[in-house]
Regions:
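Charge-dense, helix-prone N-terminal extensions
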Residues: 3-6
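Alpha/beta-hydrolase fold nucleophile elbow
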Residues: 109-121
Length: 131
C-alpha cells in the first residue's frame, strides 16, 4: 500500500458558496491522474473521504467534493433531502459547484490536468453526469 498525504482544500463556487474538499494523493513528485469523488446526498462524509484515500493508495490524486458548502454533512435523511433539493432550485448550481471542484483538483501540483475523471455515489452520480 502506497503512502499517501491528505489535506482539506478551500475553494469557492461561482455563487459565492465556500466549499471544502478533501484531497488525497500518493507521496510522489510525479503529476498523477486526478479523480473527482462526488458524495451521496449526506454530504462530504467519511465514506467519500475513504474513497478518495483508496484512490490515492492506487496511484491517483483524488478530491472528495463539498456540494453543500462549509463541509455540511448529516445522517438525517430529511436534512439531506432539503440540502439536495436546494441544489436543484437553480439548474446551474450543481454544474457550477462540480466545475469549481474539478478546476480546483486540476490546479493541484500533484495532478496532471490532462488526465481527469469523476465518480459519484447516488446523488453524486447525478452530479458527475451533469458535469
Amino acid at each position: 500500500m502506497a503512502a499517501i498525504k491528505t489535506r482539506e482544500i478551500h475553494y469557492t463556487a461561482p455563487d459565492g458558496s465556500a466549499l471544502i474538499g478533501y484531497f488525497a494523493a500518493p507521496e510522489t513528485d510525479a503529476p498523477l491522474a486526478g479523480v473527482l469523488v462526488a458524495p451521496e446526498w449526506w454530504g462530504r462524509n467519511e465514506y467519500t473521504e475513504q474513497r478518495a484515500r483508496e484512490l490515492a493508495e492506487h496511484g491517483y490524486a483524488a478530491l472528495a467534493i463539498d456540494m453543500y458548502g462549509d463541509k455540511k454533512v448529516t445522517t438525517h435523511s430529511d436534512q439531506a433531502y432539503q440540502w439536495m433539493m436546494q441544489t436543484f432550485e437553480d439548474p446551474d448550481t450543481i454544474v457550477d459547484r462540480a466545475t469549481a471542484a474539478l478546476n480546483t483538483l486540476a490546479a493541484q501540483d500533484e495532478v496532471n490536468a490532462e488526465k481527469l475523471a469523476a465518480i459519484g455515489f447516488c446523488y453524486g452520480g447525478k452530479v458527475v453526469l451533469d458535469l
